[in-house]
UniProtKB/Swiss-Prot annotation:
Function of the molecule: Transfers an acetyl group from acetyl-CoA to L-homoserine, forming acetyl-L-homoserine.
GO biological process: homoserine metabolic process; methionine biosynthetic process
Localization of this protein: Cytoplasm
EC number(s) recorded for this UniProt protein: 2.3.1.31
Name of the protein: Homoserine O-acetyltransferase
Entries under PANTHER family matching the protein: HOMOSERINE O-ACETYLTRANSFERASE
Main subcellular location: cytoplasm
Pathway: Amino-acid biosynthesis; L-methionine biosynthesis via de novo pathway; O-acetyl-L-homoserine from L-homoserine: step 1/1
Recorded GO MF terms: homoserine O-acetyltransferase activity
Amino acid sequence: MSEIALEAWGEHEALLLKPPRSPLSIPPPKPRTAVLFPRREGFYTELGGYLPEVRLRFETYGTLSRRRDNAVLVFHALTGSAHLAGTYDEETFRSLSPLEQAFGREGWWDSLVGPGRILDPALYYVVSANHLGSCYGSTGPLSLDPRTGRPYGRDFPPLTIRDLARAQARLLDHLGVEKAIVIGGSLGGMVALEFALMYPERVKKLVVLAAPARHGPWARAFNHLSRQAILQDPEYQKGNPAPKGMALARGIAMMSYRAPEGFEARWGAEPELGETYLDYQGEKFLRRFHAESYLVLSRAMDTHDVGRGRGGVEEALKRLRAIPSLFVGIDTDLLYPAWEVRQAAKAAGARYREIKSPHGHDAFLIETDQVEEILDAFLP
């Protein structure tokens, strides 16, 4: 039997039909935080900003092999966290920040990580870190600026996808990992692409789900509207949180994450419930994410262009041909259409697979049976 469940799927919370969870699970995860760029070194961003110190919040599952050859690095989407899998025990949950608690106890890709699952910790050393600029334990706008003792807030420097990839590479150094299978979806897929181009010698295999090689005008338009909803909130303009703006930003984003087929199937008989659903998602989003991190990361997405400084997108993607790569599109994705992902795969000489789903962009988080089947045919 299946059950209707309201789940926090990392970037996107979705009301969906979810299969019952397997009784086989991993031990309760323990999040950790590492200083990767200490004050004596600092972190200079691609756009000329400076952070005196950079920390990343991360979780690991499994054990690094003696040969250090079984690592899998998973990058989360825009509003995701390091909490990839497992369920926090009560002690760990109480130690989390309010935003982390609001994110939830269960990991955002829990159905893919565990005994007998595609990312089995008995076989792999799985690493998941919260991106630089986010609000779930990594250095971001909520962090204290060591120079002032106050949160960075709106003074946090602008980031690019390449900055996010560089921070993640330093985490692998910290963990003693030389090479890894690299997997990412949506924003995480953009980071995965940049990671592979910046550090090709560190990538055993590359998996890009529902992500483009360049953030084009259509996707940027959605981000622009979401940011404007926040920036135009009168409370935000007074220097306060932006509750109405954040709720509206989430609603705008949700429309790009979903597809007409899914809305019609669920709410065709009662269309007003679709509106209620968007309102609910907006209200819930206020409790689990921060406006400044949303602005920083969405702007970073808009900088994404693998061809920048590399002779154009196609020339850049050709550099990936030495890396076994898999690109996964979604047939109903409005945000990053399947043709866009397919085109990138062709230029990279990569395999291409497509998820069939009425759920749009969110399908890479929802259709985990299909994702598992696709990964099973590609991973060692």
